[in-house]
């Protein structure tokens, strides 16, 4: 029975917390989110459905207020190696939270920690284990869920794997790529977190949680490459790269900050495999079993593969799948997207600008250097693509699915938005979005975005090599489009002679 029960989620601005909140709401719980900066919660799609309070895990007074009336308290706060004393700060925060939960009369605390299999632990995993021990001694029922690499767009572990695999067709790697790991899909992590709220009160212990696959990091890179449609990677492990040097290497190759990469790399030097699956006694496996690694990667990549990337930069609703990126994820999450964005303001009304936008391409041209577009079309034809020869179906109207030179109309919102998906030969996927919105004093604002999702290292090199030419191809389009709109609006206002 969940109706009316109140859950407190700390760390709601983080990767796990931001995805857990809507799952709790869907399960019928009321949710209160605690943050040092509650205003940062406003950008989440669920912000209007929760209570936001200000609290600091090192401030007992603010925690007691946040925990008032709470049934289940989720502790999802970690110091990711922030300074020499991060372990002490983690211990202090855990003690403060445990004491506040006990005083507030919470019926359960749920903590997501790190999976380990014994032996020598990294500083990162040792700190997680210490936090778990402190919480288990809190005097209230506690569920500690221990997970290794979490597979989902936005997870630091997954983004590190994604960027390394996509950017390096061949690599010399540290020994830890041979460590055995039991990854788990974010969907299954959230299912366990929600299920832990309903554990019987006599259950107070830790549980290992992991997916069905046990793989080395090298295996995960190769399988990611296969799912992403990349060639098999050449991976040569060497014994000379320490975890510290490895984190510098990761920071150089990927956009994941070195301060986040360092503790993660350290934890990968240990074997992280589940020793038990007791959680299934209380939260049974779903029909068909837990999600495997390949399927979890496929879900994480699905948004780009199905051309849903548009929701990342347009006003479309945020997807609800846990594996999807959120608008509050850091910039390095969700895979690489390159964007060329331009804008122009005009006194012409929105309907005049839209007429020009909807009439673009074919015999009407692209409102920039014609030779540049013809050259790009010729290069596409020489490489086996469609080039510019398809033109357009109708000189004035577009509908979803229309061919438009070497583009395909992916979305049309009349008067507001035209999104085109490239069908030219590219090492990746590309979109061109043309949008119109009302401006000041009856005028309008034209926005233009070219977006590229690279496929492997060649895709990154392609974008960087053509970026200098974007000023020629895209630079004049906004100016010329609004000029055409002004001219068209002027013709509309010109009076015509009446009948004589």
Predicted features, each with a name:
Residues 422-471:
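Beta-strand/loop substructures that line and gate deep hydrophobic ligand-binding cavities in soluble
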Residues 345-354, 358-427, 440-441, 480-483:
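Glycine-rich portal/gate segments that line the openings of hydrophobic small-molecule binding cavities
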Residues 2-29:
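N-terminal Rossmann NAD(P)H-binding glycine-rich loop of SDR-like oxidoreductase domains
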Residues 20, 27, 119-230, 248-256:
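Oxidoreductase cofactor-interface core, primarily capturing Rossmann-like NAD(P)-dependent enzymes
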Residues 29-36:
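Conserved glycine-rich Rossmann-like NAD(P)H-binding loop of the short-chain dehydrogenase/reductase
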Residues 454, 459-500:
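A conserved amphipathic terminal alpha-helix motif
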Residues 195-263, 271-342:
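Mid/C-terminal beta-alpha module of Rossmann-like enzyme folds, strongest
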Residues 39-104, 114-120:
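NAD(P)H-binding glycine-rich loop region in Rossmannoid oxidoreductase-like domains
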């Amino acid at each position: 029975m969940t109706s009316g029960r109140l859950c407190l989620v700390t760390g709601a601005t983080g990767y796990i917390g931001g995805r857990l909140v809507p799952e709790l709401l869907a399960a019928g719980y009321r949710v209160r989110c605690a943050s040092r900066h509650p205003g940062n919660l406003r950008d989440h799609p669920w912000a209007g459905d929760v209570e936001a309070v200000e609290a600091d895990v090192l401030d007992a007074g603010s925690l007691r207020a946040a925990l008032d009336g709470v049934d289940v308290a989720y502790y999802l706060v970690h110091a990711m190696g922030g300074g020499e004393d991060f372990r002490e700060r983690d211990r202090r925060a855990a003690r403060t939270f445990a004491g506040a939960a006990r005083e507030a009369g919470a019926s359960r605390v749920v903590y997501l920690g790190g999976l380990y299999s014994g032996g020598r632990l990294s500083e990162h995993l040792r700190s997680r284990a210490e936090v778990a021990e402190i919480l288990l001694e809190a005097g209230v029922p506690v569920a500690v869920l221990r997970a290794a690499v979490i597979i989902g767009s936005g997870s630091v572990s997954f983004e590190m794997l994604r960027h390394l695999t996509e950017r390096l067709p061949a690599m010399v790697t540290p020994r830890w790529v041979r460590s055995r790991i039991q990854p788990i899909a974010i969907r299954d992590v959230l299912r366990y977190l929600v299920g832990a709220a309903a554990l019987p009160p006599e259950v107070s212990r830790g549980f290992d949680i992991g997916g069905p696959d046990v793989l080395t990091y090298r295996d995960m890179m190769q399988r990611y490459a296969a799912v992403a449609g990349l060639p098999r990677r050449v991976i040569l492990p060497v014994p000379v790269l320490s975890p510290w040097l490895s984190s510098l290497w990761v920071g150089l190759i990927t956009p994941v900050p070195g301060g986040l990469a360092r503790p993660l790399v350290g934890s990968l030097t240990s074997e992280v495999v589940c020793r038990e699956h007791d959680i299934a006694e209380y939260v049974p496996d779903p029909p068909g079993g837990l999600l495997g690694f390949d399927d979890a990667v496929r879900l994480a990549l699905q948004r780009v593969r199905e051309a849903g990337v548009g929701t990342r930069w347009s006003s479309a609703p945020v997807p609800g799948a846990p594996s999807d990126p959120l608008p509050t994820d850091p910039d390095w999450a969700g895979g690489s997207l390159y964007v060329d964005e331009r804008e122009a303001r005009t006194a012409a009304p929105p309907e005049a600008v839209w007429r020009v936008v909807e009439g673009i391409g074919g015999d009407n041209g692209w409102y920039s250097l014609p030779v540049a577009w013809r050259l790009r079309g010729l290069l596409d034809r020489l490489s086996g693509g469609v080039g510019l020869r398809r033109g357009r179906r109708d000189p004035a109207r577009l509908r979803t699915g229309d061919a438009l030179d070497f583009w395909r109309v992916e979305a049309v919102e009349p008067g507001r938005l035209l999104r085109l998906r490239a069908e030219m030969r590219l090492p990746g996927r590309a979109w061109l979005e043309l949008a119109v919105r009302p401006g000041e004093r009856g005028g309008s604002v034209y926005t233009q975005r070219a977006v590229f999702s690279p496929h492997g290292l060649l895709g990154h090199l392609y974008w960087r090599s053509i970026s200098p030419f974007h000023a020629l191809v895209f630079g004049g389009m906004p100016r010329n489009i609004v000029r055409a709109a002004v001219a068209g609006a002027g013709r509309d206002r010109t009076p015509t002679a009446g009948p004589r």
